[in-house]
A protein has these predicted regions:
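The conserved Walker
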Residues: 42-43
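Conserved nucleotide-sensing/catalytic segment adjacent to the nucleotide-binding pocket
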Residues: 60-66, 70-132, 137
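Hydrophobic positions on the alpha1 helix immediately C-terminal to the Walker A/P-loop
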Residues: 50
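Conserved lysine of the Walker
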Residues: 47
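Small-molecule kinase domains that catalyze NTP-dependent phosphoryl transfer to phosphate-bearing small molecules
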Residues: 171-216, 231-234
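Extended intrinsically disordered terminal tails
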Residues: 213-371
Length: 371
């Protein structure tokens, strides 16, 4: 693969020695028992909040921060690339920034400094290799990971990008394939870390950076039965609350407004992608409003729900005409309402609901024939 922006060896070395090492290494002091904090999470998950927590953890002893993204501005071509091709600037400079980060880690370990390694941790084998090396060097190793739903982190990627682009004319973007690869890889890493006793402490956090799971090694065994894999899956896949859906929909409304501004010069593809996500977010919100709020309030927010409510009433009338107990009618209507809500989430409520009266009628006819 061609690397046209890779620096010559002398320039590469000079920048590391005179700028990177000179800036990062003096911020810490050697430790008798050094600690390495490794972060994890797909792009947009909020890993920066974990770095902030680690910085506070090391406020007295200092630390060496290892983060290739933080080193990119040291590359002489990076800012120009950000102005002309901000979505690929990171990849185009990684031939230098990756080795700089690795060397900074090596120098920090040799100096027995506390270390914060800000990364996605999407590769279980790479994490295992890193933790083995750190432990052999006398480090206590912690893994702190964001357990965040893919929908939330995807939205945050766009919000970060648009915010940076609005402020400075360019922004840092993560492509969907990179996001999805990391999303799957981080989960695999968490499970491998706990199964293999790869770290001394493992902490999972929700999207607000609140801890939801913690386990520690004590005398070579986990203090609690391993459950990080299940905890991460549960948090990532739990349904959004009504308030979370409101915030999610509002986020895409704001993004759509940003892209609509003439000075943004958004491409049709960018506008279309956000519009699609905006529609999906609105459908998710409408479905939860349908589930939780009274029809009058729901239709004030989403007038298009009127058809769904009308069809539900028709099904209810049909059900009431059949020889069902009150409990049976309640069970049927609960199932109907949830099916309608699921259809609203998919954006095809009217089409799906219209079929329900026919199914109810068909079941009634079958019972009549059996009598």
């Amino acid at each position: 693969m061609s690397t046209p922006y890779k620096l010559g060896a002398e320039r590469h070395e000079s920048i590391y020695t005179n700028k990177i090492a000179a800036r990062y290494l003096p911020r810490s002091k050697p430790q008798e028992q050094p600690t390495a904090v490794i972060t994890g999470g797909q792009p947009g998950s909020g890993k920066s909040s974990l770095t902030a927590l680690a910085v506070n953890q090391f406020r007295d002893s200092g630390y060496v921060l290892v983060d290739a993204d933080k080193l990119r501005p040291f590359h002489p071509d990076y800012r120009r690339l950000m102005r002309t091709d901000d979505r690929n600037a990171a990849n185009l400079t990684h031939a230098d920034c990756g080795p700089w980060a690795n060397r900074l880690l090596r120098d920090g370990v040799e100096g027995r400094r506390n270390i914060i390694i800000d990364q996605t941790s999407r590769d279980p084998e790479a994490l295992a290799k890193m933790t083995v090396g750190l432990r052999q060097a006398g480090y206590r190793v912690e893994l702190h990971v964001m357990a965040v739903a893919a929908a939330v982190s995807e939205q945050r990627i766009h919000e970060r990008y648009e915010g940076q682009k609005e402020a400075s004319g360019f922004g840092r973007f993560s492509t969907k394939d990179k996001h999805d690869e990391a999303y799957a890889g981080v989960h695999a890493t968490v499970g491998a870390a706990e199964r293999g006793n790869l770290v001394d402490r493992l902490v999972l956090y929700d999207k607000s950076a609140q801890p939801i799971y913690e386990n520690r090694l004590e005398n070579g065994a986990w203090r609690s039965a391993p459950g990080a894999d299940q905890a991460m899956k549960a948090e990532r896949t739990r349904p959004m609350t009504l308030q979370e859906r409101r915030e999610y929909a509002a986020g895409f409304d704001a993004l759509a407004d940003k892209l609509a501004r003439p000075e943004r010069k958004a491409t049709p593809e960018e506008v279309g992608r956000i519009a699609e996500m905006q529609r999906n977010a609105r459908s998710l919100l409408a479905a939860e409003v349908f589930r939780q709020e009274k029809p009058e309030a729901a239709m004030r927010q989403f007038p298009e729900l009127a058809t769904a409510y009308a069809n539900v009433r028709a099904i209810e009338a049909k059900t009431n005409s059949e020889r069902l107990t009150a409990q049976q009618r309640e069970t049927v209507m609960a199932r109907v309402r949830e099916n309608v809500a699921a259809s609203i989430e998919r954006g095809d409520a009217a089409k799906v609901v219209r079929a329900e009266p026919e199914r109810v009628s068909h079941r009634s006819q079958e019972r009549d024939l059996k009598r």
